[in-house]
Design a protein with these regions (language model features):
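Positively charged n-region of N-terminal signal peptides that target proteins for export
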Residues: 1-4, 8-9
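Enrichment for repetitive, rod-forming helical segments
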Residues: 9-10, 105
Length: 251
């Protein structure tokens, strides 16, 4: 069970991070691509993410919810700051985990009284840390645009199953210990809604996914809903840290 939950959480985080990239003469594709390019140049973002999972394991159902408040800011080419507070609710229990990245250290508070820190080189993840708030159109096989009552662009899209399955396989490469040698995972359906304002800022992204997975000989059918709302980007972002980081135990 622990292995199944671990891979489910890893998969959801990978997919949620992948899913979330005026003039009337412009096509919907051109408007979306312009917002995507702008999002890729961001050096800071503040967002709230919610993930809801419903799983069916051989007739046994299990629901899990997770929320995350995150602030990420690039200080320089070699330094970044991050604050993320995650709240997970499963089987009637809530677990709150805090993670921070500052001054070359990764800090973690497991919510049970353990507070640790460890040296961490930003350069190790710099190539993977591009802040992108919109889903790449390379994954899509359908994209439709309307406008809401505030004049924002609302994009409804469908993700191509083969492309996303290939992306998921690559993203989770090296995590065989989670699903085991005989484990597998396949996305059966994935759709989303992305809201972009007139200045090409991504305001929110919602994704619905249906997935089947096998781990530890157990077949799991899963429905996942991910919602991300961006509160601020760029200079408007301030990364907030707790006052007691100096008291964390180095490991």
């Amino acid at each position: 069970m622990k292995r199944i939950l671990a891979v489910l959480m890893s998969t959801a985080m990978v997919l949620s991070l992948a899913a979330c990239s005026q003039e009337t003469a412009k096509t919907p594709e051109e408007i979306y691509d312009e917002a995507l390019v702008k999002s890729m140049s961001l050096d800071a973002l503040d967002g709230d993410m919610e993930i809801a999972m419903d799983m069916d394991m051989g007739g046994m159902t299990l629901g899990m919810k997770m929320s995350a408040d995150m602030q990420i800011k690039k200080i320089s080419d070699t330094e970044s700051e991050m604050a993320m507070v995650m709240n997970t609710s499963i089987l009637g229990q809530e677990v709150v985990i805090e993670e921070y990245f500052k001054d070359g250290y990764l800090y973690m508070n497991d919510g049970a009284g353990t507070k640790v820190k460890a040296p961490f080189e930003y350069s190790e993840i710099a190539g993977q840390a591009t802040m992108n708030t919109a889903t790449s159109r390379d994954f899509m096989d359908k994209l439709e645009m309307t406008e809401d009552e505030n004049g924002n662009y609302v994009f409804n899209y469908t993700i191509a199953q083969d492309k996303m399955n290939e992306y998921l396989s690559d993203a989770l490469e090296g995590m065989d210990e989670l699903v085991g040698d005989t484990g597998s995972y396949t996305i059966g359906e994935m759709t989303g809604t992305c809201v972009i304002d007139k200045d090409y800022n991504v305001l929110s992204d919602k994704v619905h996914m249906v997935m089947n997975m096998t781990a530890e000989g157990q077949e799991v059918a899963m429905s996942v809903d991910v919602s991300i709302v961006y509160n601020a980007v760029g200079d408007a972002v301030t990364v907030s840290f707790p006052d007691d980081l100096d008291s964390y135990t180095e490991v």
